[in-house]
Design a protein with these regions (language model features):
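Chalcogenol-based redox active-site neighborhoods
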Residues: 69, 90, 229-232
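A short, surface-exposed interaction/processing loop segment used at functional sites
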Residues: 202-230
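Extracellular/periplasmic head regions of type IV pilus-like filament subunits
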Residues: 94-200, 206-207, 233-236
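Aliphatic-rich helix starts adjacent to a transmembrane/signal segment
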Residues: 72-89
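N-terminal leader/signal peptides at the extreme start of proteins
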Residues: 1-50
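N-terminal single-pass transmembrane signal-anchor helix
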Residues: 46-73
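Disulfide-bonded cysteine motifs in exported proteins
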Residues: 5, 152-155, 228-229
Length: 236
């Protein structure tokens, strides 16, 4: 209701003719400015301009609108980024299981992989057999620059090209030796700037359930891949 009144006020101030504006501002002074009424009367308009009081009112309204809108925009942005982070892990989960079930690296063993990789890198989600053929890829090329320390445990969310503000990395909860990879995988997603890009770290393992936890990092700091398999379920 307050926001609607403020919007109406802005439109009246900016769009009405001078005589109508003068009457409207007089009414505004009586109802909102109280004892500033006399000061408002003493202010002289320059030709085609506004009084100091009127400019102060407009500046105040802009400040109020900014205070109302900016936090909501930030929340919406964070929610969108976190939803995309969950989708990243869903994509990696599906790719891992396709790699596992179909023995796509052709080694005769059903196993997972800890590599995002790139074209020509075998035993990776980007190129299971190392053929260099994009049709064999289980994930697209944007993952190549979104991964941290590919093939090993990720520590800090610092990657060349984050996806929706998140980097991905291999989880420290899972080994990277051949025996471990026969039964489990683990990927995590962490934000490049805590509380401005996202609030939560995410992870997923062979049980296929996305886990999440609120980052402990201060605002603006890189995420530290804090989610583990013991975290609560987070949807997806």
């Amino acid at each position: 209701m307050i926001s609607f009144f403020i919007l109406v006020l802005c439109l009246r101030l900016l769009l009405k003719r001078e005589e109508e504006l003068k009457g409207f501002l007089l009414s505004l002074r009586l109802t909102l400015l109280g004892d500033l009424k006399m000061a408002a009367r003493e202010q002289k308009k320059t030709e085609g301009g506004f009084t100091l009081i009127e400019l102060l009112v407009v500046a105040t309204i802009i400040g109020i609108l900014t205070a109302l809108v900016v936090p909501n925009l930030l929340k919406a942005r964070i929610s969108s980024n976190e939803a995309n982070a969950r989708k990243l892990l869903q994509t990696l989960r599906d790719a891992e299981y396709e790699y596992f079930e179909q023995d796509l690296n052709g080694n005769g063993v059903r196993d997972f992989t800890n590599l995002i990789g790139s074209s020509g890198v075998e035993d990776s989600l980007r190129d299971p057999r190392g053929t260099g053929d994009e049709e064999d890829a289980l994930i697209d090329s944007t993952f190549e620059d979104a991964v941290v320390n590919d093939g090993d445990t990720a520590n800090e969310a610092n990657c060349p090209a984050p996806k929706a503000g998140y980097c991905v990395g291999w989880s420290g909860d899972v080994g990277s030796d051949p025996l471990s990879l026969q039964g489990d995988f683990g990927w995590e997603a962490s934000m490049i700037s805590a509380h401005t890009v996202g609030r939560k770290d995410f992870s997923i393992f062979a049980d296929k359930v996305i886990k999440c936890t609120v980052t402990s990092q201060p605002s603006g700091s890189p995420g530290q891949f804090e989610s583990t398999r013991s975290d609560p379920d987070c949807g997806g």
